[in-house]
């Protein structure tokens, strides 16, 4: 096997997402063909997904409850242990590219105003990621909080999940609102692994909330045995250190398909979860809800 590329647009993301995931995988392959390592490929794929306004990352990210703020998280990791992340970065087009620059510093994670200032110093232009769709999602969230929306009459599994999740974790009913992550895992021809992820977080969140993505071992992890990227409710993923847990199973010799299935099974059915896994013996995509994804193996 010369390469393995897996991409996803987030568990419960729109059904129209697979073609964008395929284009992201193509961008990753282009990075490999240009001589880049696995890390460059994972970053390229994730940046493409950030640019698709249907996904909750980069352009199209969820507004916070204040209706003004978009705070984005992103992270990248290579199998040699290099890691870089940003949390609550604002008004940049591609947070994953800023995270990649953090990886080149002595730091692991930059947050808030410091992360945004870092991006500006490196020449990342100011970019407004707000879309009309994000404003509509925010309006539905406020209606649910006021009690004049989200009556629970949902007609599909994803909608029912969001209604249950809102009641379980935020104590109110709500219309379906995606609050997930985009990401990629890659193995290159030299056996190097990498993972990358990006998210706009949840509308049902206070300003300053940080999810799983920028926490090493929670949303992503990569090492000499493989790479893992997760998507779902960030707090629940972080509590279980999902990516590192699945990676440790790979290191113990568990097959990627089995490791991915076990990772999803760590969560009760009410919590939507998905993982991408690539190891030395193969690759796997697993989720308990719809999750647009793509893979290239060559």
Model-inferred region functions:
Residues 1-298:
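Alpha/propeptide regions of enzymes that mature by internal proteolysis
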